């Protein structure tokens, strides 16, 4: 069984080339199915997609042996290395095998690996290296890692995609799945996968006449409802063993789905109910990792290995660390059906924090591995007002359920900070949405389960800012965001310089007058320091809205804080207990069946 195949960069992937191959000297040429090395060339596959995570394969799976396979023709030297992170933080490596080859026709070389290393001491990753000397050339046509261990577990994987009016993205991903997996005889998922698309926008073909695809029109009750419907549809087939939740607007990699499937097939019994999580790589800087799992620390989300440049070998190794993760985001998250049956469905929170809450509820750390990922647009400059409402309301729900010792004081501090940051960003409507989120949280789970989520969302959208205006001057391009700032996290920080904080980020000082200054929506509050007029915009659409410094907003803030404090002090404990008591009902199959059915009925009555 091949557990990992050697991947070569395809056309249009120049920026990602070092995620596949590293050239230390000489030159090479890539073709569709082969790699040609010129003389005096040295290449390594110690990369994100081609290094073998041997330590994780041996930890989580039943494999008893491991072989490296390389198909080449020509002359050169083949080497297999084991590389790991030393206790001091450096990189150590050991040569496991070296083979000189000289062949006029393609020849497959297979090297046994585990007998060359102590299984108890296996660390890090394995990789292949090929070198040609003077007058030597070769062509690499195939490679990978195999095991003779036979899978004893039947895996039937269902991919559940939730979408809302993103036909282009969904169609593209479905085509990739069809061509690269379902119709590909060389894929382990050949005619052994099913895709369920929950269509919250009702814009896709209703009945897909395809054995591998089901499209389910669904009420737009948010991503949580879309994924709940996908889970429910998957569970109708008793043969389904795992549900892979996936966002509609990601760029998928077929080999990631194949690796997920192979991991599931070979997992040790003690890990059979573990979730497998995929990392998110940025779609603008495609070699930068945005997150590989996340931790939830006292109510604050911490992305693991964020801003990591995966072109660097040391970062590929660092990514092998099993740092504790509490959840994996649902842009790529594979959940065993047995876990869904035991732990239930998502909370009906529309969007945001549904994946965090589910990870905390299951209480199991997701398995993550290099190469299992998707590409997705980064979030720092997509800041719709409505997100403030969902972030605050849903964070209050999650913290009350899972953060020990969380009470009204902690909730009040979180709310005050959120409102203050919005004040510093001149987003006064968002301040009111934060307050609305607190009020709605205190209404309790009964209100949450009975409210019409689509109507609420529509109302919230009309309450917040809209990116509809065009700036008459020149605005910075999205690409002007410095890569160094992304790698260090400076581009997306709410931290404010202490000196600026003493003046409330310039609110206690005279504003600098002048023409409105364009500021990207996700920029840090310090970018607004002493600004009078600003134009806040989305760099993707180039649309935005005007705002300016209003002193009355500063003076009104203490009164709103006082109102919220009194309300939290009086009602928070009751609401918290109510959510704790209702969690089982809110995440049950019975609730979701009734909830979605009622939404369908209301929708039909309006027609």
Residue map of PLM features:
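Active-site donor/metal-binding and catalytic loop motifs
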Residues: 141-149, 369-385
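Conserved donor NDP-sugar-binding/catalytic core segment of glycosyltransferases
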Residues: 255-303
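A recurrent flexible, glycine/aromatic-enriched loop bordering the glycosyltransferase active site
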Residues: 306-333, 382
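Short beta-strand-to-loop acidic/aromatic patch adjacent to the donor-nucleotide binding site
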Residues: 238-251
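Donor nucleotide-sugar recognition loop
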Residues: 330-332, 341-360, 365-374, 386-387
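Short, well-formed alpha-helical segments that are part of the catalytic scaffolds
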Residues: 166-185
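Terminal low-complexity segments of carbohydrate-biosynthetic enzymes
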Residues: 1-125, 130-131, 393-394, 400-607
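Conserved donor nucleotide-binding strand/loop of the catalytic core
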Residues: 208-225, 233
């Amino acid at each position: 069984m091949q557990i990992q195949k050697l991947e070569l960069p395809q056309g249009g992937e120049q920026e990602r080339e070092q995620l596949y191959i590293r050239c230390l000297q000489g030159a090479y040429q890539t073709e569709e199915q082969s790699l040609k090395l010129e003389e005096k060339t040295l290449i390594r596959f110690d990369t994100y997609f081609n290094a073998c995570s041997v330590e994780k394969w041996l930890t989580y799976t039943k494999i008893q042996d491991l072989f490296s396979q390389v198909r080449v023709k020509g002359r050169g030297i083949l080497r297999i290395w084991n590389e790991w992170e030393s206790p001091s933080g450096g990189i150590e490596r050991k040569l496991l095998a070296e083979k000189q080859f000289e062949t006029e026709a393609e020849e497959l070389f297979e090297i046994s690996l585990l007998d060359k290393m102590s299984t108890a001491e296996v660390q890090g990753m394995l990789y292949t290296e090929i070198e040609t000397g003077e007058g030597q050339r070769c062509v690499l046509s195939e490679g990978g890692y195999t095991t003779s261990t036979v899978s004893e577990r039947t895996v039937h994987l269902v991919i559940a995609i939730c979408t809302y009016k993103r036909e282009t993205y969904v169609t593209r991903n479905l085509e990739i799945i069809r061509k690269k997996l379902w119709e590909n005889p060389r894929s382990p998922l050949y005619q052994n996968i099913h895709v369920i698309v929950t269509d919250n926008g009702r814009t896709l073909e209703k009945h897909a006449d395809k054995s591998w695809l089901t499209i389910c029109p669904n009420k737009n009750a948010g991503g949580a409802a879309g994924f709940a419907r996908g889970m429910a549809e998957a569970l109708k087939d008793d043969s389904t063993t795992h549900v892979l939740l996936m966002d509609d607007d990601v760029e998928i990699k077929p080999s990631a789905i194949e690796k997920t499937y192979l991991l599931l097939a070979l997992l040790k019994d003690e890990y059979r109910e573990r979730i497998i999580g995929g990392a998110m790589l940025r779609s603008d800087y495609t070699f930068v990792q945005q997150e590989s799992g996340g931790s939830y620390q006292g109510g604050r989300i911490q992305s693991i290995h964020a801003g990591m440049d995966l072109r660097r070998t040391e970062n590929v190794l660092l990514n092998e660390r099993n740092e504790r993760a509490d959840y994996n985001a649902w842009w790529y998250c594979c959940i065993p059906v047995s876990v869904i049956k035991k732990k239930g469905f998502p909370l009906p929170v529309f969007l945001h924090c549904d994946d965090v809450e589910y990870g905390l509820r299951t209480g199991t750390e997701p398995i993550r591995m290099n190469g299992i990922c998707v590409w997705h647009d980064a979030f720092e400059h997509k800041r719709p007002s409505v997100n403030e409402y969902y972030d605050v309301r849903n964070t209050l729900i999650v913290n009350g359920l899972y953060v020990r010792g969380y009470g009204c004081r902690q909730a009040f501090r979180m709310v005050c900070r959120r409102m203050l940051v919005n004040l510093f960003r001149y987003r006064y409507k968002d301040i009111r949405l934060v307050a609305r989120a607190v009020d709605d949280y205190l209404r309790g789970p009964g209100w949450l389960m009975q409210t019409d989520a689509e109507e609420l969302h529509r109302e919230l959208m009309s309450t917040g800012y809209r990116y509809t205006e065009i700036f008459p001057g020149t605005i910075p391009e999205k690409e002007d965001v410095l890569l160094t700032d992304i790698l260090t996290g400076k581009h997306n920080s709410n931290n404010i310089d202490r000196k600026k904080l003493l003046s409330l980020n310039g609110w206690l000082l005279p504003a600098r007058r002048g023409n409105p200054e364009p500021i990207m929506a996700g920029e840090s509050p310090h970018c607004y320091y002493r600004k009078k007029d600003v134009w806040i915009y989305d760099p993707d659409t180039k649309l935005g809205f005007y705002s300016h410094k209003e002193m009355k907003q500063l003076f009104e803030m203490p009164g709103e804080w006082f109102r919220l404090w009194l309300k939290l002090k009086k009602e928070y404990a009751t609401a918290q207990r109510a959510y704790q008591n209702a969690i089982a009902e809110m995440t049950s199959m019975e609730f979701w069946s009734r909830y979605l059915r009622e939404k369908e009925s209301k929708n039909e009555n309006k027609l």
